[in-house]
Amino acid sequence: ITVEDHAIIGYDATILCHEFLQDEYRTGEVVIGERAMIGAGAVILPGVEIGAGAQVAANSLVARDVPADATVAGVPAEPVDRR
């Protein structure tokens, strides 16, 4: 797990580098970019990269990479408009 400068990880967030599934065992490096924000209770799955300045809403499940400066929310996490 790599957490870059000034990233914020909320209370009770879970960052996984490995995952046991019924028929497979997944592993992967997780990178939390500079100034990224992970909300409370969010779950980041193995192999995901959260880009610099990205935001993950509380209680979201992140299964795919999040681009820099994007905001994602939900289960599974999807991009949301930050108007």
Segment roles from a protein language model:
Residues 56:
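Binuclear metal-ion centers of metallo-dependent hydrolases, dominated by the metallo-beta-lactamase
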Residues 12, 59-60:
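Active-site-flanking alpha-helical
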Residues 1-50, 75-76, 80-83:
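Flexible, glycine/small-residue-enriched loop-and-beta-strand segment within the central core
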Residues 67-68, 73-76:
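Acidic, glycine-centered active-site loop in nucleotide-sugar glycosyltransferases
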Residues 53:
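Catalytic-loop signature of eukaryotic-like protein kinases
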